[in-house]
């Protein structure tokens, strides 16, 4: 996993809550900073891909590890 500036643990939350929390966190971050999101909802894989495309942010990494999904999102 690459370096990141902030981490959001959305484990146990069902969509759309991980997306909404990520959006709120990203809004407080500066352009170019990276957010690491941890989620347990399998639907979050598609959701974060679509979220990045809709918002213009870059989904740098998306992987599953130990039953958790990890996303690195770079704020545009």
UniProtKB/Swiss-Prot annotation:
CDD domains: SirA_YedF_YeeD (cd00291). It is found in: Cytoplasm. Signal peptide: none annotated. Disulfide bonds: none annotated. Mostly a monomer, a small portion forms homodimer via intermolecular disulfide bonds. Tightly interacts with DsrEFH. Sulfur carrier protein involved in sulfur trafficking for oxidative dissimilatory sulfur metabolism. Component of a sulfur relay system that starts with the sulfur-mobilizing rhodanese-like protein Rhd_2599 (Alvin_2599), which transfers the sulfur from a low-molecular-weight thiol, maybe glutathione, to the TusA protein (Alvin_2600); TusA serves as the sulfur donor for DsrEFH, which persulfurates DsrC; persulfurated DsrC very probably serves as a direct substrate for reverse-acting sulfite reductase, DsrAB. Pathway: Energy metabolism; sulfur metabolism. Keywords: Cytoplasm, Disulfide bond. Its main location: cytoplasm. One of its GO terms (cellular component) is cytoplasm. Induction: Up-regulated under sulfur-oxidizing conditions (at mRNA level), i.e. when grown on reduced sulfur compounds such as sulfide, thiosulfate or elemental sulfur. TusA is one of the major proteins in A.vinosum cells grown on malate or on reduced sulfur compounds. The active site is at 15 (cysteine persulfide intermediate). The keyword Cytoplasm applies. One of its GO terms (biological process) is sulfur compound metabolic process. It comes from Allochromatium vinosum (strain ATCC 17899 / DSM 180 / NBRC 103801 / NCIMB 10441 / D) (Chromatium vinosum). This is Sulfur carrier protein TusA. Disruption phenotype: A mutant strain lacking rhd_2599, tusA and dsrE2, although not viable in liquid culture, is clearly sulfur oxidation negative upon growth on solid media containing sulfide, and shows massive accumulation of intercellular sulfur globules. The keyword Protein biosynthesis does not apply. Transmembrane segments: none annotated. Belongs to the sulfur carrier protein TusA family. It holds the Pfam family TusA. InterPro entries: TusA-like, TusA-like_sf.
């Amino acid at each position: 996993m690459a370096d990141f500036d902030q981490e959001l643990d959305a484990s146990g939350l069902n969509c759309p809550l991980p997306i909404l929390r990520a959006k709120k966190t990203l809004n407080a971050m500066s352009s170019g900073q990276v957010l690491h999101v941890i989620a347990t909802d399998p639907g979050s894989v598609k959701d974060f891909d679509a979220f990045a495309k809709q918002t213009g942010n870059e989904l740098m990494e998306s992987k599953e590890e130990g039953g958790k999904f990890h996303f690195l999102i770079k704020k545009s």
